[in-house]
């Protein structure tokens, strides 16, 4: 039975409405010092062919030996995806010819992958969430790289990537919009980074997506899909899907048919172009690799790895909401990047009262800090304001030493000049005025100067905010707004 189609997910064509169906295969480079079947380095940026073993170059007589750390990383990832771990899996040869594939085949897993079905819960910007099913995760070798701009009449081959371990994470076709697809890949990358199993660096090619797109009339069976190969940014994933869906709709509405094919996305033109006809599994002539025994490990290994998993984004988000009273949205923003969550937790650790000021800390991190970082194009690691400095500013507010307005001025000073917030408050005379007599004098002056406003506020008590603002302005923001509010109510008989 087909699930109801959300109107926002439908695309209007010339002859009616269409629905996208999207599935994604993510190729994530395993975080490991050595390759999947050799001891060669996986370091990025070396000279061409400087990280190549005899196994990677497919020299005769060289046999592959499995890297245990890559197996552990795949199991950790499967556990992080709430997936079934297969205690026995098999490596297969995927046969095809390409110049940068020296063996003439890729060692992969076909019928018996290391990880089975799982799922990812994905949050959207509007506060809703949806589930993407994971069909499987398998280990495989990466290929080398063909360089076509080194010589005018020939191509060069760099085998540094050849044999690097990849996890291919295959989703079910559960996405119905480019927004959902972008959100899914973003969430998956976040999980991998929390686990430490892939750094998710798409610019270096450490995370790449093959995006399968088809269109259909709502309620009809799946259409013929096209695969958009090796999309290397979240933004490009969205652009590629939007273009490809429109392209297919145009063909179908003109009476044509969709060819099942592999396509490439051209980010300069914002369009996809045909690469080759899409292969079926039988085209690759899979068979078990005779040089590798089946991969077997115990449930005890799985249990030990599970016990050692870090707190993952969904768990951290739930804790922030339950323990600190954060909104679901704020908690989701904070956990969306591992570094952001770590920064926020460092702020909490330095606060005098984390339970009291946890929500205030979230507001400061999200609105003030993230806003400033985004404006200047800086990462959280490059923040001029440290977690301990931000915690000190929040403590100064919480204990009544400075007002919220002065705190923003103090934040600007720390951002630009650095320094200890407490020392800066003392040195620059930024302390909040707490003397009731001094505050009362300012209030009396404002009330005496505005008799018309006094009459208005007595008729409409909610206008008291105008008086509070005037007092704050007259005092340079150095008085406690709540004290001003209470004093005004007493003076005006509200």
UniProtKB/Swiss-Prot annotation:
This enzyme catalyses:
L-glutamyl-tRNA(Gln) + L-glutamine + ATP + H2O = L-glutaminyl-tRNA(Gln) + L-glutamate + ADP + phosphate + H(+); L-aspartyl-tRNA(Asn) + L-glutamine + ATP + H2O = L-asparaginyl-tRNA(Asn) + L-glutamate + ADP + phosphate + 2 H(+)
Keyword terms, alphabetized: ATP-binding, Ligase, Nucleotide-binding, Protein biosynthesis
Q: What is its EC number?
A: 6.3.5.-
State one Pfam family annotation. GatB_N
List the cysteine pairs that form cystine. Answer: none
SUPFAM superfamilies in the record = GatB/YqeY motif, Glutamine synthetase/guanido kinase
Can you cite a GO biological process for this protein?
Answer: glutaminyl-tRNAGln biosynthesis via transamidation
InterPro entries for this protein? Asn/Gln-tRNA_amidoTrfase_suB/E, Asn/Gln-tRNA_Trfase_suB/E_cat, Asn/Gln_amidotransferase, Asn/Gln_tRNA_amidoTrase-B-like, GatB, GatB_C_1, GatB_Yqey_C_2, Gln-tRNA_amidoTrfase_suB_CS
Named from the GO MF annotations, one term is: glutaminyl-tRNA synthase (glutamine-hydrolyzing) activity
On subunit structure and binding partners, the annotation says: Heterotrimer of A, B and C subunits.
Family in the record = Belongs to the GatB/GatE family. GatB subfamily.
As for what it does, the entry says:
Allows the formation of correctly charged Asn-tRNA(Asn) or Gln-tRNA(Gln) through the transamidation of misacylated Asp-tRNA(Asn) or Glu-tRNA(Gln) in organisms which lack either or both of asparaginyl-tRNA or glutaminyl-tRNA synthetases. The reaction takes place in the presence of glutamine and ATP through an activated phospho-Asp-tRNA(Asn) or phospho-Glu-tRNA(Gln).
Q: Which PANTHER family match?
A: GLUTAMYL-TRNA GLN AMIDOTRANSFERASE SUBUNIT B MITOCHONDRIAL AND PROKARYOTIC PET112-RELATED, GLUTAMYL-TRNA(GLN) AMIDOTRANSFERASE SUBUNIT B, MITOCHONDRIAL
NCBIfam families assigned: gatB (TIGR00133), PRK05477.1-2 (NF004012), PRK05477.1-4 (NF004014), PRK05477.1-5 (NF004015)
Identify this protein by name: Aspartyl/glutamyl-tRNA(Asn/Gln) amidotransferase subunit B
């Amino acid at each position: 039975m087909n699930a109801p189609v959300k109107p926002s997910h439908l695309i209007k064509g010339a002859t009616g409405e269409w629905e996208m169906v999207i599935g994604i295969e993510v190729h994530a480079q395993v975080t490991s010092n050595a390759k999947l079947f050799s001891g060669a380095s996986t370091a990025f940026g070396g000279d061409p062919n400087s990280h190549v073993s005899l196994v990677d170059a497919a020299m005769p007589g060289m046999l592959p030996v499995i890297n245990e750390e890559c197996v552990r990383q795949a199991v950790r990832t499967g556990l992080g995806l709430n997936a079934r771990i297969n205690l026995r899996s098999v490596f297969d040869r995927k046969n095809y010819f390409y110049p940068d594939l020296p063996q003439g085949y890729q060692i992969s897993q076909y019928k018996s992958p290391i990880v089975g079905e799982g799922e990812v819960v994905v949050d959207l910007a509007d506060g809703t969430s949806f589930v993407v099913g994971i069909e499987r995760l398998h280990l495989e070798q990466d290929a080398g790289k063909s360089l076509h701009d080194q010589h005018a009449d020939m191509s060069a081959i760099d085998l540094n990537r050849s044999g690097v371990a990849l996890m291919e994470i295959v989703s079910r076709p559960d996405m119905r919009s480019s927004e959902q697809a972008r959100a899914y890949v973003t969430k998956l990358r976040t999980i991998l980074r929390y686990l430490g199993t892939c750094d998710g660096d798409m610019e270096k090619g450490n995370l790449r997506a093959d995006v399968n797109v088809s269109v259909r009339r709502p309620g009809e069976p799946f259409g013929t899909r096209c695969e958009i190969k090796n999309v290397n940014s979240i933004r490009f994933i969205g652009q590629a899907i939007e273009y490809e869906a429109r392209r297919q709709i145009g063909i179908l509405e003109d009476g044509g048919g969709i060819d099942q094919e592999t396509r490439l996305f051209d980010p300069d033109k914002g369009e996809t172009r045909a690469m080759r006809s899409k292969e079926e599994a039988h085209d690759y002539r899979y068979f078990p690799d005779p040089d590798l025994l089946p991969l077997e490990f115990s449930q005890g290994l799985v249990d030990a790895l599970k016990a050692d998993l870090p707190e993952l984004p969904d768990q951290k988000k739930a804790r922030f909401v339950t323990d600190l009273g954060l909104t679901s949205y704020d908690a989701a923003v904070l956990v969306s990047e591992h570094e952001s969550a770590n920064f926020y937790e460092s702020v909490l650790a330095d606060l005098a009262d984390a339970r009291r000021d946890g929500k205030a800390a979230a507001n400061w991190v999200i609105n003030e800090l993230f806003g400033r970082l985004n404006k200047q194009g800086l990462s959280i690691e490059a923040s001029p304001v440290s977690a301990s400095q931000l915690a000190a500013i929040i403590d100064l507010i919480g204990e009544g030493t400075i007002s919220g307005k002065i705190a923003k001025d103090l934040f600007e000073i720390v951002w630009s000049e650095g320094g200890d917030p407490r020392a800066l408050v003392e040195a620059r005379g930024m302390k909040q005025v707490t003397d009731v007599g001094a505050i009362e004098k300012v209030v009396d002056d404002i009330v005496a100067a505005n008799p018309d406003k006094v009459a208005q506020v007595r008729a409409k008590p909610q206008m008291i905010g105008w008086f509070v603002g005037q007092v704050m302005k007259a005092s340079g923001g150095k008085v406690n707004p709540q004290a001003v509010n209470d004093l005004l109510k007493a003076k005006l008989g509200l």
